[in-house]
């Protein structure tokens, strides 16, 4: 139906292109007039455009500056601050509107200038990544279309080889004229540096500065690169610098400018594939115990071994029963138990490829899945643990729990976690216990709860490590380290680690060194980071299939740009085989056929293991070939460059080499161009389209096909039932192949199912992070305000006003004068005296006013004796130190909340709603603590003596050592909020390059006791159980 409408009314993309085509004509008309200009005259035109643009926006910038200056006034009132902030918000909105209108006006002339600059550069030789390059690019009309779409804040889909890198120069140049900075985001450091060096002649011609952010750069280098008009870098580097800027100790430590305009190259990879992976800066957990996994590991190995024996028995039973009674339900049940116990068992997969077996097992599964899987426990109870491969979940059964409890010897109640609330209530109500005994008993309950919970968590993670994660598929082991393999590119992700102890569990499994645990100090998801940009756009060769998600999450429209020359690549229907063995044999046969012909072939694989299997088979046939996977990524550029030569055979995991075009060698066009052979379908149609897109660039000939088997993961989990049925009916023999458009469509439907599932996970992740994002926004704004102001006196006095009212209210019910006086002395070190009768007569309001005045006088006296610059430092230290400490604690509490929130679903409660409510309570509580402790610190801090200064310097050295141990991670968290809970984590990409001296810590005049210290009032109780309540 949709296609009929498109034929009548035209497609959305046709309409999009039709709207902007007149702009292209205008650009070309202006471009034609520039031919007679000298280089200096052309430069003068770009300078004039920049100057005029800046002049148009000067007035509004000045208004903004004047208003911001008023906020520095120490005597400003809260109502005045709120009024000024409202005006600033209105001004910012107006500024963005005027900037957009001004850029729209100069777009045709600016694009014409860039196009003419490219023409003038033709034949210019220069160095790119130590290779000599000759400029030979002038934007085509379709590239101008792409540039306009990017400037409009949309995603442009352009086929491979259409020159997306050149397209980005057009909107980057235009938006750089604002002086607000443009960020061009790429997928790795190599492409960031290459693209910057490759495109720099266009910008340098007009004096526009370009920079690049690379991992390993020091803060001062980063600051210099960000100061450029255009900065290239990866999403990780931009994101981590944002987080580090929000941990900075002084304005001089900030490296980034504003987030004005971002252009994301390979936008689907960055905004979709990476979207399940939050950016995290973490620090080490003190006294972390890494031996806990080695204690449990022998138990787990025995459990897994017993399960394997159990599954082998069920398979033997199924074989035996089927021989006697082909359709017996007992055989079907045995097969189902084998599948639930070890779904990737080689013998099971082979049996299911036999005629009728998969259908037999499916009949049993359908029976037990009825009524929301109500009877599935009957299947699972006979196993030690069950695996649901589709949802990546694993569940220990009662049989498994009993087995592990026996192995633990001393702990027969291993799986009984105490109900802390009930236990504590019982202790509190036990009148036979004195205070000390109660404290001791409570500590025992907490310790038992903590020990049991941790042990159960470690058992769960080790079970996943042994049953769900496979070496050379999900990860590789290199140089004694477990390294995650990117499922989309096949590349190793250096330093990226799984979270919640899963990575340590895999390290224990593989007998390598178990690294220490870390705790989150700052975090943001990719989605919420890129939402910071005032304007965002992106480009890729494959975005149309993800257009709904790009619009839903980022409000990015997708526009498909027509190719400069028609694509003539032949995309064949899939070849479907019953077993992997048959499929691999067919692939090798096809490669030999193509090599004899001289036609280059690129074989795409989904894992390191498959690429090495095919490589072994080719070596056995003495076929010369190259392998590009996570283990052999060092020669990537060289291998990709030679993949289009006559007779070349290249095996590459997924899209390794993406971002580099494969150019055809001499005579290859006549042979049919590059032949793409996919060894299996990926979960995402987009990844398959990317693989096909390696061939047929710029109108070159080419061919693509996928070889699929019913044993492939995608087919096994989501798509094989109908295809198996067809094969069984046709009586297919070994080696036979199905090739039909209906089968290809069936496979694409299976892919769509997985895509929808992954989208829901990413959307759920965003819904959870949106809660934290609003809180992060409040905290970071407050922190940045404190960081950039010279004095924070007005903020301190505002806190004092609220404190006075709240504290007086607290003691007003019983007119507890002594309690009030002691509280003020503890909190502010202020001697506040008031008679009991006065307290009663004056009431709350007047008493609060007296308290405010007394504290104010104390603070003013302090200002009289402490130099203004030092007072500014004291206030800033108080605010920043407390915010950072409390935010870290809050993140830890939020992590704990996330871990157990899904269990609320068992109580018929929506986990997300519960999470929002709990997170809000935690946030409100944290804000109260921040305000109270900030005020307390500001009053108690005084300049240091010389003796104390030496002590502080020693502490600073310790602090710097801890700072250097911070790591930036890009957490791999696709199941972070799912019941499966494996939360594959994150990226310990590099040390955090803060490189900053910590703020000088003044001496605290009156130290509040620690929560477990004896209370200073002399009661003999701990502080937390007495005055610290």
From Swiss-Prot:
Protein name: Protein translocase subunit SecA
PROSITE patterns xrefs: SECA, SECA_MOTOR_DEAD
Any one Gene Ontology BP term: protein import
Function comment: Part of the Sec protein translocase complex. Interacts with the SecYEG preprotein conducting channel. Has a central role in coupling the hydrolysis of ATP to the transfer of proteins into and across the cell membrane, serving as an ATP-driven molecular motor driving the stepwise translocation of polypeptide chains across the membrane.
InterPro entries cross-referenced by the UniProt entry: Helicase_ATP-bd, Helicase_C-like, P-loop_NTPase, SEC_C_motif, SecA, SecA_CS, SecA_DEAD, SecA_motor_DEAD
Family designation: Belongs to the SecA family.
Keyword Cytoplasm appears in the UniProt entry: yes
The organism's place on the tree of life at top rank: Bacteria
SMART domains named among the record's database cross-references: SecA_DEAD, SecA_PP_bind
Main location: membrane
CDD domains, per the entry: DEXDc_SecA, SF2_C_secA
Residues covered by region (Disordered): 953-1029
Quaternary organization: Monomer and homodimer. Part of the essential Sec protein translocation apparatus which comprises SecA, SecYEG and auxiliary proteins SecDF. Other proteins may also be involved.
Biological classification of the source: Bacteria, Pseudomonadati, Chlorobiota, Chlorobiia, Chlorobiales
Pfam families linked to this entry: P-loop_SecA, SEC-C, SecA_DEAD, SecA_PP_bind, SecA_SW
Binding locations of Zn(2+): 1015, 1017, 1026-1027
Segments of skewed composition (Basic and acidic residues): 966-975, 984-996
Compartment(s) where it occurs, according to its Swiss-Prot or TrEMBL record: Cell inner membrane; Cytoplasm
Topology within the bilayer: Peripheral membrane protein
Record keywords, A-Z: ATP-binding, Cell inner membrane, Cell membrane, Cytoplasm, Membrane, Metal-binding, Nucleotide-binding, Protein transport, Translocase, Translocation, Transport, Zinc
Positions contributing to ATP binding: 143, 161-165, 661
């Amino acid at each position: 139906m949709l296609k009929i409408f498109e034929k009548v009314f035209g497609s959305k993309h046709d309409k999009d292109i039709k709207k902007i085509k007149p702009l292209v004509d205008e650009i070309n008309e202006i471009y034609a007039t520039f031919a007679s200009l000298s280089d200096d005259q052309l430069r003068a035109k770009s300078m004039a455009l920049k100057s005029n643009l800046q002049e148009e926006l000067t007035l509004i910038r000045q208004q903004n500056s004047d208003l911001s200056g008023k906020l520095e006034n120490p005597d400003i009132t809260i109502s005045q601050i709120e009024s000024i902030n409202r005006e600033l918000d209105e001004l910012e909105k107006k500024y963005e509107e005027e900037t957009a209108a001004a850029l729209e006006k100069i777009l045709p002339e600016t694009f014409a200038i860039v196009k003419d600059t490219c023409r003038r550069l033709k034949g210019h030789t220069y160095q790119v990544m130590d290779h000599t390059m000759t400029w030979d690019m002038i934007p085509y009309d379709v590239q101008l279309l792409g540039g306009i779409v990017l400037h409009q804040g949309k995603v442009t889909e352009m086929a491979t080889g259409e020159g997306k890198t050149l397209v980005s120069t057009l909107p980057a140049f235009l938006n750089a004229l604002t002086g607000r900075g443009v960020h061009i985001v790429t997928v790795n450091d190599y492409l960031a540096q290459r693209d910057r060096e490759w495109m720099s002649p266009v910008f340098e011609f007009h004096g526009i500065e370009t920079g690049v952010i690379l991992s390993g750069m020091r803060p001062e280098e980063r600051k210099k690169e960000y100061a450029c008009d255009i900065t290239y870098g990866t999403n990780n580097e931009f994101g981590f610098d944002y987080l580090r800027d929000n941990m900075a100790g002084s304005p001089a430590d900030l490296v980034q400018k504003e987030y004005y305009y971002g252009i994301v190259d390979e936008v689907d990879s960055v905004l979709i594939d990476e979207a399940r992976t939050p950016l995290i800066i973490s620090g080490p957990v003190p006294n972390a115990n890494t031996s806990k996994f080695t204690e449990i590991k022998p138990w787990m190995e025995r459990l897994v071994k017993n399960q394997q024996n159990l599954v082998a028995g069920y398979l033997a039973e199924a074989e035996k029963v089927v021989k006697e009674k082909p359709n017996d339900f007992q055989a079907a049940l045995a097969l189902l138990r084998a599948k639930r116990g070890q779904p990737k068992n080689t013998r099971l997969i082979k049996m299911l490829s036999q005629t009728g077996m998969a259908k037999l097992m499916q009949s049993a599964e359908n029976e037990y899945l009825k009524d929301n899987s109500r009877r599935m426990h009957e299947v699972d109870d006979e196993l030690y643990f069950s695996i649901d491969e589709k949802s990546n979940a694993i569940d220990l059964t009662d049989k498994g729990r009993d087995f592990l409890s026996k192995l633990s010897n001393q702990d027969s109640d291993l799986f009984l976690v105490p109900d802390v609330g009930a236990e504590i209530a019982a202790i509190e109500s036990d009148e036979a216990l004195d205070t000390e005994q109660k404290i001791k008993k409570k500590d025992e309950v907490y310790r038992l709860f903590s020990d049991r919970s941790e042990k159960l968590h470690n058992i769960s993670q080790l079970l996943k490590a042994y049953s769900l994660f496979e070496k050379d598929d999900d990860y590789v082991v290199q140089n004694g380290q477990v390294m995650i393999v990117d499922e989309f590119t096949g590349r190793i992700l250096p330093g990226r680690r799984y979270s919640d102890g899963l990575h340590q569990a895999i390290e224990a499994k593989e007998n390598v060194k178990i690294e220490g645990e870390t705790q989150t100090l700052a975090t943001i998801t990719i989605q919420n980071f890129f939402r910071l940009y005032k304007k965002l756009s992106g480009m890729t060769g494959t975005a149309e299939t993800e257009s709904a998600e790009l619009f839903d999450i980022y409000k990015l429209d997708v526009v498909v740009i027509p190719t400069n020359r028609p694509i003539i690549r032949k995309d064949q229907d899939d070849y479907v085989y019953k077993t992997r063995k048959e499929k691999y044999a067919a692939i090798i046969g096809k490669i030999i056929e193509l090599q004899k012909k001289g036609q280059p072939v690129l074989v795409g694989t989904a894992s390191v293991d498959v690429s090495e299997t095919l490589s072994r088979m080719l070596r056995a046939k003495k076929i010369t070939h190259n392998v590009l996977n996570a283990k052999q990524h060092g020669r990537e550029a060289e291998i990709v460059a030679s993949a289009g030569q006559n007779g070349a055979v290249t095996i590459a995991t997924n899209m390794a080499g993406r971002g580099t075009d494969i150019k055809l060698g001499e005579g290859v066009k006549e042979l049919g161009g590059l032949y793409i052979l996919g060894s299996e379908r990926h979960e995402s149609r987009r990844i398959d389209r990317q693989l096909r897109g390696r061939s047929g660039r710029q109108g070159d000939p080419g061919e693509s096909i996928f070889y699929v088997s019913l044993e492939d993961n995608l087919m096994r989990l989501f798509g094989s039932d109908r295809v198996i049925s067809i094969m069984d009916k046709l009586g297919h023999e070994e080696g036979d192949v199905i090739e039909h458009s209906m089968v290809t469509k069936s496979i694409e439907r299976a892919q769509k199912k997985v895509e929808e599932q992954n989208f829901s996970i990413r959307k759920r992740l965003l819904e959870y992070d949106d809660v934290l994002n609003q809180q992060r926004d409040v905290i970071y704004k407050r922190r940045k305000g404190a960081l950039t102001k010279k004095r924070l006196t007005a903020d301190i006095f505002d806190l004092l006003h609220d404190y006075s009212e709240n504290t007086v209210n607290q003691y007003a019910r019983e007119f507890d004068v002594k309690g009030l006086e002691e509280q003020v002395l503890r909190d502010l070190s202020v001697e506040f005296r008031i008679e009991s009768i006065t307290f009663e007569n004056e009431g709350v309001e007047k008493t609060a006013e007296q308290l405010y005045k007394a504290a104010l006088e104390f603070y003013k006296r302090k200002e009289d004796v402490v130099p203004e610059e030092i007072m500014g430092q004291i206030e800033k230290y108080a605010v920043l130190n407390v915010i950072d400490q409390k935010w870290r604690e809050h993140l830890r509490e939020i992590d704990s909340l996330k871990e157990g929130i899904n269990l609320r679903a068992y109580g018929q409660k929506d986990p997300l709603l519960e999470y929002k409510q709990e997170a809000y309570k935690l946030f409100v509580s944290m804000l109260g603590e921040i305000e109270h402790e900030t005020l307390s610190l500001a009053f108690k801090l005084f300049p240091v003596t010389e003796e104390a200064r030496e002590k502080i310097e020693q502490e600073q050295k310790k602090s710097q050592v801890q700072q250097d141990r911070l790591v930036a991670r890009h957490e791999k968290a696709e199941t972070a909020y799912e019941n499966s809970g494996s939360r594959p984590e994150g990226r310990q990409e590099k040390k955090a390059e803060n490189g900053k001296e910590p703020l000088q810590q003044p001496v605290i005049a009156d130290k509040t006791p620690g929560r477990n210290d004896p209370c200073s009032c002399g009661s003999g109780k701990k502080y937390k159980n007495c005055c610290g309540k």
